[in-house]
Amino acid sequence: PYTERPQPPFTTSTLQQEAARKLRFAAQRTMRAAQRLYENGFITYMRTDSTTLSTQAEEAARALIGKEFGDEYMPDKPRTYSTKVKNAQEAHEAIRPAGEAFTHPNDLSADMGVDERKLYDLIWRRTGASQMRDAKGQRTTMTRVMATKEHGDARFTATGRTVDFAGYRLAYVQDLDDTDAEAAKA
């Protein structure tokens, strides 16, 4: 069996890394879109090393989980994450949707561009997922031995995982890019 915990909410560097990996955005493009989202009141300040969420943000994330995914995906108490960077700039909390209730990505104002919408969706999903239950499943291994005339036995091994409870992965797939994530949901 395996248990997989969600990643913490975004810091500046993790947002840039994930936007590059999932959205193919350069760091400058990510920060431009984040700046616009911040200036329009959709996200918190985007220059931070902190992974902590305020109590208000934890409550908003839990409300999002209950509404979008169901109470069975919500842990008994909010998750907390410690910042690993020494001398971290923790005056600001993690990058997250702003406000007492997180705006759904479909409800962003019409004047937000495509980059802003994509980046906000990434932030919204990661913040929600950071407060969801662990994903759980089983590891499987299959080995096949085949006899060959010239080289003796040949051994083939395949490993994989099955999912018993998707947990946070319903909201945010960490190890796949967007096209793989969409295929996984289908």
Give the ranges of each region predicted by the language model:
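Extended, well-ordered alpha-helical scaffold/bundle regions in very large, multi-domain proteins
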Residues: F25-Q89, I95
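Long, highly charged, low-complexity internal segments
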Residues: P1-Q35, E39, G70-D71, K86, ...
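GHKL/Bergerat-fold ATPase module in large chromosome/replication-associated machines
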Residues: P97-E100
